Amino acid sequence: MKLNYKRTIFVGFAFFLICSFWQAYDNTIPLILTNKFGMSQAWSGVIMALDNVLALFMLPLFGAISDKHRGKRGRRTPFIVVGTLIAAVMLIALSFVDNAQLRHLSDVSAIDDPAALEQIYDRQANETLLTPSGDKFVLSQKFTQEEFIRIRSQVEQDGKTVTNPDYTNYVVPARQACAWDATAKSPATLVFFIVLLLIVLVSMAVFRSPAVALMPDVTLKPLRSKANAVINLMGSAGGILVLALGMVFATSAVRNSLMSYTGYFAVIAAIMLSALVIFMLTVREKEWAYEMQQQAVALGIEEETQAQEEAAGGRKLSVDEVKSLIFLLLSIVLWFFGYNAVTSKYSVYASNILHKDYNLTLIIAQAAAIVSYLPVGFIASKAGRKKTILAGVVMLTTAFTVAAFLNAESPTMLMNAMFALAGIAWATINVNSFPMVVEMCSGGDVGKYTGFYYTASMAAQVATPMLSGLLMDRFGMHVLFPYAAVFTTLAFVTMLFVRHGDSKPQAKLGLEALDEMED
């Protein structure tokens, strides 16, 4: 028994385009909402949670629908094609609405422009505002108008050009207040933006479960951790490509905080469509799924009657399996509570607290994950999925705990090291958690159980942007990493109670043992 890496890579192009989209979405939408619409962290968190609210019912629904779908292209492929096409078109349309809002801010949007700074000061001089750290201030009590209009986004320090803390602490919040005033005066643009955002999110939700369920459809159960490592490797490749693109477009630069995203989103859409074309030209879903079922019978992994019942539905779980599934899903909720809080807020945190390029830091995390995926899949096949996940949770908690003590003066290398550790940890968790869920079901229920997995993760992602945003508004942005560390610690505890879903020792399969001897 040996994993067909070529086929798995081709299947992974669906996840590649999904991760490309979400990397761009998570990094840019919070910046648009806060910088151009002037939303608080809490309200931007509400908007960022919309996709997760939709996912709570749409992912299980479309996972189950795809289980029952019988089409010429297979069960999953039609959903992937339709969802991707709509999402790519609507993403570009979203940038046009973003540009419309930018026009409402034309008198205050120019960076380092004295006239724009004068307008900001005149409008917000006597308002009580908040720094990114949560400290209240009144602009007129901190600066005269002449002092304020001399503030620049960057200053020279020790021979280096660095972000000016006065700019991020005082100019940015004041300009965001102006943006909120413009939004309140003309709310139609925000309404239209949210409507288009909903269309994009619905189209992505339509095919996420079918896309992820395709891997178990065409992969034997003992090989799914290795296959999921390849799938996640493809996803990370999509994410790191978008992060590199962000560096090219300088999306995290202070001078580009009010940039137009049309060109950037157009390239993202092109990447998604290119991946879809490769997927369509290479993946033979129905043929590969049938071959997998025949191999499962030949190797004794499933009885012939089980394989024949794949299309009809699944089996009922035992009481112990139900308990394990509940604790596993609870663990998924908890570690996503911690992890997604960081990913959804880090672009804002890095810009305002660390004064660092979030693209570079996240690229390091993705690169570390990419290097780890295949070794982690191999380790899990030997040590077991549960033990491997527990090790990953410990690493993730360590990374978040150390990161909580870092600030703008901390060595950049140290923050990069912590994000590298977090990338390795997340790879360790991600490679094994999804296979543990689908290990408990039959092939006829893979889409439904994929929906369970994503319902758990999305339930956390509904609440955590709002909760972390509220805490950041109340106590300052420094609360982000301690918040994340608490939830990953709780995930370690609940994971200890999971007793089912682990990979079975491969040595039990004679053909596989022979294959390993040949290797």
Predicted feature descriptions by range:
Residues 206-219, 428-442:
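Intracellular juxtamembrane helix-capping segments at the cytosolic ends
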Residues 68-84, 382-394:
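Cytoplasmic membrane-interface "Motif A"-like loop-to-helix N-cap segments
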Residues 57-73, 372-385, 472:
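Helix-to-loop junctions at the C-terminal end of transmembrane segments
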Residues 1-52, 130, 134-137, 148, ...:
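Helix-loop boundary and gating motifs at the non-cytosolic
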Residues 41-42, 221-231, 441-453:
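Loop-to-transmembrane helix entry/capping segments in MFS-fold secondary transporters
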Residues 387-430:
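C-terminal transmembrane helical hairpin of 12-TM major facilitator-type secondary transporters
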Residues 1-3, 104, 109-196, 202-207, ...:
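Intracellular loop-helix junctions on the cytosolic face of multi-pass helical membrane proteins
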